[in-house]
């Protein structure tokens, strides 16, 4: 196996590994001893799902989150400099996409280390695929402002981009606030603007549906505490 920084996708929920990850990923993972991870506990759980025989005590984990300093991240790559492959694991989906993993990849690229992204589920890409919206030009904005006035202003800005740039706009909300987000979208966006709701992607109860804002009114699904991506287009 070539020495590299491997970007290791994980499942988006309790989905069976074989449903969303190729067997090649396992071949890579079982040969790595150093992992840079967003959450140590969930990373250990994922690795045991990949191979129950993995000896967790023989592995080294380096926590990576929004509080990790650039200096610490740079130090994490010491095993790679010494010729040992490393893996990057997010809490869900693909590392380095809307994820702290991007910081370690940037440092690896700057230091000319080989970076190898592996195949796996991305809720952003899958929601675009299932929406019927423009897949050539789209933007993911993460969380919108919590303050109602700021949020509605931001929604109007994103909707304006839909019509001026023909660009799909994607964003998320903390699962327990999904319904409030939907209410704000329906109050703020034009009746003809299309809204795709993509919830529980790849998991049991997956729901991906596109309707106009007008069509959604009075017919919203129950999304409380369910991971969800919202996207709008014309």
Q: Model regions: which residues?
A:
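A contiguous loop/helix-start segment that scaffolds small-molecule binding in enzyme catalytic cores
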Residues: 2-6, 84-85, 164-234
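Short active-site oxyanion
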Residues: 29-35, 112-116, 168-169
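Short glycine-rich anion-binding loops that position phosphate/pyrophosphate groups of nucleotides
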Residues: 12-14, 91-95, 175-176
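Conserved helicase motor
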Residues: 62-69, 144-148
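Glycine-rich, flexible N-terminal cofactor/catalytic loop recognition
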Residues: 1-64
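Glycine/small-residue-rich loop that forms an oxyanion/phosphate-binding "nest" at active or ligand-binding sites
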Residues: 65, 73-115
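Acidic beta-strand-to-loop metal/phosphate-binding motif
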Residues: 36-37, 87-93, 168-173
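Class I SAM-dependent methyltransferase SAM-binding "motif I" and its flanking Rossmann-like core
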Residues: 6, 103-161
């Amino acid at each position: 196996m070539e020495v590299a920084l491997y970007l290791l996708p994980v499942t988006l929920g309790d989905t069976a590994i074989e449903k969303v990850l190729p067997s090649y990923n396992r071949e890579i993972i079982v040969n790595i001893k150093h992992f840079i991870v967003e959450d140590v506990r969930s990373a250990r759980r994922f690795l045991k799902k990949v191979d129950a025989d993995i000896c967790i005590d023989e592995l080294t984990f380096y926590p990576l989150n929004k509080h990790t300093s650039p200096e610490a991240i740079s130090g994490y790559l010491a095993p790679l400099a010494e010729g040992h492959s490393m893996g990057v694991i997010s809490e869900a989906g693909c590392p380095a996409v809307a994820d702290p993993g991007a910081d370690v990849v940037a440092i690896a690229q700057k230091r000319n280390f080989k970076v190898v992204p592996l195949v796996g589920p991305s809720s952003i890409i899958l929601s675009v695929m299932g929406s019927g919206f423009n897949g050539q030009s789209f933007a993911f904005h993460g969380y919108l402002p919590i303050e109602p006035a700021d949020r509605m202003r931001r929604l109007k800005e994103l909707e304006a981009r839909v019509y001026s740039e023909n660009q799909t706009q994607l964003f998320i909300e903390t699962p327990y606030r999904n319904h409030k987000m939907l209410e704000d979208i329906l109050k703020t966006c034009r009746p003809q603007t299309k809204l795709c709701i993509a919830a529980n992607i790849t998991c049991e109860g997956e729901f991906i549906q596109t309707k106009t804002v007008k069509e959604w009114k009075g017919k919203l699904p129950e999304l409380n505490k369910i991971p969800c991506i919202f996207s709008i287009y014309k």
